[in-house]
């Protein structure tokens, strides 16, 4: 603990607020909150911490704090700071899992769509659904029952759905605003649990149609009722009042927490969400922060009611979330909370050993790698690889590993702009220059280690840009491959020397994974780019074939060869004029055409 931290600890106030832990670069690596800042922050430096917390404390070189007037303000501030800084040790909600919802848009001609994005717009959202199939099946059922618009851009001409009786937006006299509101209200009622009343009304209509000898209409209604039964009865009933609820249960051990969330919609348990993560504050404060972020900063629609176990500050959560947050003390609701807690315990016990082993293995790998290179532990590693075929469509790719694990959000692809021909060294210079010029311009975090796929030439090219042009002093290593294109050795220094990594060591496995991953990412990007240029180049040369017609042809015929075999009549069926179809076929079947 340095002198600066000692001084700050001595003057910490005993008030609610948030604290920001920083590393040697001034980067915020952890954000926390507390009712009493002095007690909480001091506990990191003066308590007996587990290995995980010790690792965090070892990286802390400074901290800041912000005092708030209440615990509610501290919770809201904590969530906003975590969203702003995305600290490495605040990992509780980084899986980006999102669920499908049904949405009625707020357009003049509203649509019913499946979406995973919750926007603050005037649309109405219903869900979440356990998977996209369940959401689409429900949408399909509602499409049969209610004639909302199906097409994206109604042109005024009747569409296929209009002729099927499933869309009125293209009719000569489309529904009025009032009629649309009535349809939207019926769909909303259906999705909020009113499908039983709708089923009952349909049964009455079927009876009347049958009595009037209108058997065709009676059969249509019967089919609709069967679709309702098939779609809505797939899920197990759990509560009789059909209120939308989320139920939280949690368990913790050895500095790790598991949270189980049960999604109850229309009285039915439709899905559960499991999160396992390390935590550094008290369990009670951690679960409150988790639930707050779950709704305010993640892709989750707030239900009418949230149920939580005993010991959670439900009043604080209710004020922050502005919904009902209850602690049930008896009955079926209490049983469901206990079930969520039990599932959290089981999940934690099942996953704990695997998570702990994986954590130890990856941390050990980067620590060993740092020791072998005689540098500080490389928490952030950026790796580069180039790809081209005889200089055509040259590309480069960069991947990021943080604490021994890939962070795919940080991956980047580069089309090479200035290099002509197969020059791997100039390609490396260009991509390193572009990457770290931007890092400096936008004040982005610098890596602890850069790895390039290649030997002395690639390393020299990268160092030339980093040190001579940009004035950066970042450790750089190279990865050489054997004749079977497998990771052979790690090179470091200039001139490069072989780093003696044991082939069975975690450090060697790590650099091998990095080399394989950056190669995969680069070659995939190159194939996509090359495939796109080969696939579309010939169509681009034909007068009268713009982007829409090109997409239409490729979507229908799948390949250039299949387009060659088509007839003018085949293309006319797609709405392509005869003269354009003739131009396409003449061009593609000319002797100078290259096969693709």
Swiss-Prot record:
GO biological process, one term: nucleotide-excision repair
Key words of the record: Cytoplasm, DNA damage, DNA excision, DNA repair, Excision nuclease, SOS response
Single GO cellular component term: excinuclease repair complex
Every UVR domain range: 196-231
PANTHER family tied to this protein: UVRABC SYSTEM PROTEIN C, UVRC/OXIDOREDUCTASE
The family this protein is said to belong to: Belongs to the UvrC family.
UniProt protein name: UvrABC system protein C
Record organism: Oceanobacillus iheyensis (strain DSM 14371 / CIP 107618 / JCM 11309 / KCTC 3954 / HTE831)
Gene giving rise to this polypeptide: uvrC
């Amino acid at each position: 603990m340095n002198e600066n931290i000692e001084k700050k600890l001595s003057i910490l106030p005993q008030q609610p607020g948030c604290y920001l832990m920083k590393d040697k670069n001034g980067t915020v690596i952890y954000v926390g909150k507390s009712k009493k800042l002095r007690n909480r922050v001091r506990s990191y430096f003066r308590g007996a911490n587990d290995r995980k917390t010790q690792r965090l404390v070892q990286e802390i070189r400074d901290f800041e704090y912000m005092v708030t007037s209440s615990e509610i303000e501290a919770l809201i501030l904590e969530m906003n700071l975590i969203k702003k800084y995305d600290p490495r040790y605040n990992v509780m909600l980084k899986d980006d899992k999102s669920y499908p919802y049904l949405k009625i848009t707020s357009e003049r001609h509203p649509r019913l769509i499946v979406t995973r994005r919750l926007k603050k717009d005037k649309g109405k959202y219903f869900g979440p659904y356990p998977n996209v199939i369940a959401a689409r099946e429900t949408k399909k059922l509602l499409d049969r029952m209610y004639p909302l618009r199906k097409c994206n851009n109604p042109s005024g001409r009747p569409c296929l759905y209009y002729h099927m009786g499933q869309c009125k937006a293209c009719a000569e006299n489309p529904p009025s605003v009032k009629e649309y509101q009535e349809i939207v209200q019926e769909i909303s009622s259906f999705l909020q649990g009113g499908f039983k009343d709708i089923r009952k009304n349909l049964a009455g209509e079927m009876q009347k149609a049958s009595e009037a000898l209108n058997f065709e209409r009676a059969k249509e209604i019967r089919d609709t009722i069967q679709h309702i039964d098939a779609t809505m009865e797939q899920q197990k009933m759990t509560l009789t009042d059909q209120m939308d609820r989320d139920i939280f249960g949690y368990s913790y051990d050895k500095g790790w927490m598991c949270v189980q969330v049960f999604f109850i919609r229309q009285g039915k348990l439709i899905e559960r969400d499991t999160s396992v993560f390390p935590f550094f504050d008290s369990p009670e404060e951690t679960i409150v922060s988790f639930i707050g972020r779950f709704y305010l900063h993640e892709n989750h629609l707030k239900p009418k009611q949230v149920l939580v176990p005993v010991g959670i500050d439900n009043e604080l959560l209710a004020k922050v979330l502005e919904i009902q947050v209850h602690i049930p003390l008896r009955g079926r609701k209490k049983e469901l909370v206990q079930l969520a807690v039990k599932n959290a315990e089981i999940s934690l016990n099942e996953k704990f050993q695997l998570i702990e082993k994986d954590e130890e293995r990856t941390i050990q790998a980067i620590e060993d790698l740092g020791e072998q290179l005689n540098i500080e532990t490389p928490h952030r590693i950026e790796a580069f690889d180039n790809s081209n075929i005889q200089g055509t469509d040259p590309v480069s790719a960069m991947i990021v590993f943080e604490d021994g694990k890939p962070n795919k959000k940080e991956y980047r692809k580069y089309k090479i702009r200035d290099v002509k021909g197969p020059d791997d060294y100039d390609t490396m210079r260009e991509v390193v220059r572009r990457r770290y010029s931007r890092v400096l311009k936008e004040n982005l975090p610098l890596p602890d280690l850069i790895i390039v796929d290649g030997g002395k030439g690639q390393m020299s090219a990268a160092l030339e840009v980093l040190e001579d042009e940009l004035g950066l002093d970042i450790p750089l290593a190279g990865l050489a491959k054997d004749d079977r294109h497998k990771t052979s050795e790690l090179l470091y220094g200039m001139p490069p020397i072989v780093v003696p990594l044991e082939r069975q060591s975690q450090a060697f496995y790590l650099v091998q994974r990095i080399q394989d991953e950056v190669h995969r990412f680069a070659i995939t990007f190159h194939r996509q780019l090359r495939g796109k240029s080969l696939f579309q180049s010939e169509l681009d040369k034909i007068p009268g074939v713009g982007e829409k017609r090109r997409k239409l042809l490729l979507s229908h015929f799948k390949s250039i060869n299949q387009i060659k075999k088509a007839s003018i009549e085949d293309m006319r069926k797609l709405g392509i004029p005869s003269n354009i179809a003739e131009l396409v076929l003449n061009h593609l079947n000319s002797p100078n055409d290259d096969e693709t």
